[in-house]
Swiss-Prot record:
ATP binds at residues 157-164. This is ATP synthase subunit beta. It comes from Salinibacter ruber (strain DSM 13855 / M31). F-type ATPases have 2 components, CF(1) - the catalytic core - and CF(0) - the membrane proton channel. CF(1) has five subunits: alpha(3), beta(3), gamma(1), delta(1), epsilon(1). CF(0) has three main subunits: a(1), b(2) and c(9-12). The alpha and beta chains form an alternating ring which encloses part of the gamma chain. CF(1) is attached to CF(0) by a central stalk formed by the gamma and epsilon chains, while a peripheral stalk is formed by the delta and b chains. Produces ATP from ADP in the presence of a proton gradient across the membrane. The catalytic sites are hosted primarily by the beta subunits. Keywords: ATP synthesis, ATP-binding, Cell inner membrane, Cell membrane, CF(1), Hydrogen ion transport, Ion transport, Membrane, Nucleotide-binding, Translocase, Transport. InterPro entries: AAA+_ATPase (IPR003593), ATP-synt_VA_C (IPR055190), ATP_synth_F1_bsu (IPR005722), ATPase_a/bsu_AS (IPR020003), ATPase_alpha/beta_chains (IPR050053), ATPase_F1/V1/A1_a/bsu_N (IPR004100), ATPase_F1/V1/A1_a/bsu_N_sf (IPR036121), ATPase_F1/V1/A1_a/bsu_nucl-bd (IPR000194). GO terms for cellular component: plasma membrane; proton-transporting ATP synthase complex. The gene is atpD. The keyword Transit peptide does not apply.
Length: 500
């Protein structure tokens, strides 16, 4: 935050964890959502956000960083403006915290403008819709739940089923294939995952620190003196914003808005198609729950804040496409205890164009990505938007998988021999379809040892059509697992046949 000349001085009267009560002159009481600033000699200034007016001169604020070391009577300044973040081409390739301070070890970006993180959504007459499909290169997503350009996609799953890996693969695939600008907001997730993401983006060329830095990184170093700022600002296609799980609830509740503000800048002033990745929207809700409890509000269902729906709406309504450009968002949603009826994921559902449900059952079978094709949905899955071939192939895939699921109990009790020839054929093809829905990821190469695959939509449709038409019934099932195109499956199947 920049230090303004119109700041009003006050003093701290109470500190309770991340909550700070402050007193100001009667004619200088800050507004709700205004930023407060506390100077700290040994580190960066502490930024807080006003949440409540307690009386004539007192306000209650939530801190965006640790309040360790604060004392009653200590000076505090009202900035008379909301929290703001730097915007401009200079923020490409950079990492920021919730208040726009760089956390990548590099100097502050030299920008001419900052923008408040609290903004109104675009007016109704500025909005625009799209029937264009955004190709992701991930077979199961492109076929079963195509992503609309400018739409919102939710990735639902419990702990450890692959939400963050899927987000990282989407960043890698879409940034490379479409060369669009991306903004990533890490909300309440592991710091290690943030570090992994940064390294992955540099290795993939989505973030560019220059050739000298890349060479030092490949040799095991991390020499920031070798960063080429001109190349970073012109060639990098992503900006990262983090408010991780070790940070106070204020930071986790606002870092999504920080990332969204940057995405809105690229959309409105750059006239670009922007990708906005949010990992994890549940942590945003969880932070709001903590803040609500700290403010003394009465909880609602399952202990969530009474303002859950309106807070979610404030965030989601800003993620939209205008006549200037589009924001396509991918939001990871942690599902507590794998319960999709929990208020947090249930409230998120209402705002989404696509829902991608990750299945623990598929994960345990080793089918990755573990996306459930029967639970996942898309508003784009219609013949008018996709064309006849794509639509019919997707419906046939869902139909055969549904039939396989219906026969599971019979198979478990009586075995395959009791099925009719027609059902046996359906089961065999469904198992091949299920395995062909898997594919190796670029971001998981170091774990799987298999090179990642980007599969165009046309190849995806061709492959599934061949399986459904029975052209590949002679190939063993394991030939279909973790392959890219159908040609790779045929090649692997022929090799297996020769070995046998």
């Amino acid at each position: 935050m920049e230090v303004g000349s119109n700041e009003v001085k006050g003093k701290i009267v109470e500190v309770l964890g991340p909550v700070v009560d402050a007193e100001f002159p009667r004619d200088g009481v800050p507004d709700i959502l205004d930023a407060l600033r506390i100077e700290r000699e040994d580190s960066r200034d502490l930024i807080l956000e006003v949440q409540q007016h307690l009386g004539e001169r007192r306000v209650r604020a939530i801190a965006m960083d640790s309040t360790d070391g604060l004392q009653r009577g200590q000076a505090i300044a009202a900035t008379n403006q909301p929290i703001s973040v730097p915007i401009g081409e200079e923020i490409r390739g950079r990492l920021f915290n919730v208040v726009g301070q760089p956390i990548d070890g590099l100097p502050e970006p030299d920008v001419d403008e900052r923008r408040a993180i609290h903004q109104d959504p675009p007016e109704y007459n500025e909005l625009t819709g799209s029937q264009e499909v955004l190709e992701t290169g991930i077979k199961v997503m492109d076929l079963i739940q195509p992503v609309p350009k400018g739409g919102k996609v939710g990735l639902f799953g419990g702990a450890g089923v692959g939400k963050t890996v899927l987000i990282m693969e989407l960043i890698n695939n879409i940034a490379k294939a479409h060369e669009g600008l991306s903004v990533f907001s890490g909300v309440g997730e592991r710091t290690r995952e943030g570090n992994d993401l940064l390294r992955e983006m540099i290795e993939a060329g989505v973030m560019t620190y220059g050739e000298e830095f890349r060479e030092s990184m490949e040799s095991g170093g991390w020499d920031l003196d070798k960063v080429d700022f001109d190349e970073m600002n012109s060639e990098s296609n992503i900006s990262l914003v983090f408010g991780q799980m070790n940070e106070p609830p204020g930071a986790r509740a606002r870092v999504g808005l920080t990332g969204l503000t940057i995405a809105e800048y690229f959309r409105d002033l750059g006239g670009r198609d922007v990708l906005f990745f949010l990992d994890n929207i549940f942590r945003f809700v969880q932070a709001g729950q903590e803040m609500s409890a700290l403010m003394g509000r009465m909880p609602s269902a399952v202990g969530y804040q009474p303002t859950l729906a309106s807070e979610m709406g404030d965030l989601q309504e800003r993620i939209t496409s205008t006549q200037e450009g589009s924001i396509t968002s991918f939001q990871a949603v942690y599902v507590p205890a794998d319960d999709l009826t929990d208020p947090a994921p249930a409230t998120t559902f209402a705002h989404l164009d696509c829902t991608t449900v990750l299945s623990r059952q598929l994960s345990t079978q080793g089918i990755y990505p573990a996306i459930d094709p029967l639970d996942s949905t898309s508003q784009m899955l219609n013949e008018r938007a996709l064309g006849t071939e794509h639509y019919e192939t997707a419906q046939d895939v869902k139909e055969i998988l549904q039939r396989y699921e219906e026969l599971q109990d019979i198979i478990a009790i009586l075995g395959m021999d009791e099925l009719s020839d027609e059902d046996k054929q359906a089961v065999n093809r469904a198992r091949r379809v299920q395995r062909f829905l898997s594919q190796p990821f670029f971001v998981a190469e170091q774990f799987t040892g298999q090179p990642g695959k980007y599969v165009p939509i046309e190849e995806t449709i061709r492959g599934f059509r061949m399986i459904l038409d029975g052209e590949l019934d002679h190939l063993p099932e394991r030939a279909f697992l973790l392959k890219g195109t159908i040609d790779e499956v045929i090649e692997a199947g022929e090799e297996m046949a020769e070995e046998a």
